[in-house]
Design a protein with these regions (language model features):
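A short, aromatic/hydrophobic, helix- or strand-capping loop or linear motif
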Residues: 21-23, 67-73, 108-118
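Short, solvent-exposed aromatic-acidic interface loops
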Residues: 48-52, 102-104
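Short beta-strand segments
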Residues: 14-49, 65-68, 78-81
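Helix-adjacent hinge/juxtasegments
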Residues: 53-89
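Extreme N-terminal tail/first-helix region
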Residues: 1-16
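Amphipathic alpha-helical interface surfaces
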Residues: 7, 53-56, 94-98
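Charged, gly/pro-rich active-site loop segments
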Residues: 77-135
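A generic structural signal for nonpolar/aromatic side chains embedded in well-ordered alpha-helices
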Residues: 10-11, 56-57, 102, 133
Length: 135
């Protein structure tokens, strides 16, 4: 099994990615978020705009991430470690694509599918935060 095969298997089995972000002063913050990926090069998650990591990404888009299985015995764990630049999705086609990625992943995990209605988080909040990640 190649390293790429191992990484893909970890991403396929993972439900959460741990995001490491920093605020404008460089103060770090790590948070697990449910993620979806379709092509192993772009990760998507939907975030509340007030979430600390969303606010951090708005001022400092450089992030680090790790996906791993925390249930395996000590000394046997494997993970996928990544650095990337995160960005809020604003293009309607990109948002629709990302929601589609989420829907397919949700169904794969035995949950309901997502529709475009999920792209409207809160009508009283001036902006939604949809984050796409590219290496």
């Amino acid at each position: 099994m190649t390293n790429d095969d191992i990484a893909r298997a970890i991403l396929d089995a993972g439900i959460y990615v741990v995001l490491a972000t920093a605020d404008v002063d460089g103060v770090p913050w790590a948070s697990p978020v449910w993620f979806a990926t379709e092509n192993y090069r772009e990760l998507y998650w939907v975030s509340y705009p007030g979430a600390r990591y969303s606010q951090n990404i708005a001022v400092r888009p450089q992030i680090a991430m790790v996906v791993f299985d925390s249930t395996v015995p000590a000394g046997t764990g494997q993970g996928v470690y990544m650095t990337a630049t995160a960005e809020q999705l604003s293009d309607p086609a990109a948002i629709e694509y990302g929601i589609g990625v989420f829907s397919r992943e949700s169904v794969r995990q035995g949950n309901e599918g997502w529709g475009i209605e999920y792209s409207i988080l809160d009508p009283d909040v001036p902006q939604d935060v949809r984050i796409g990640v590219r290496p």
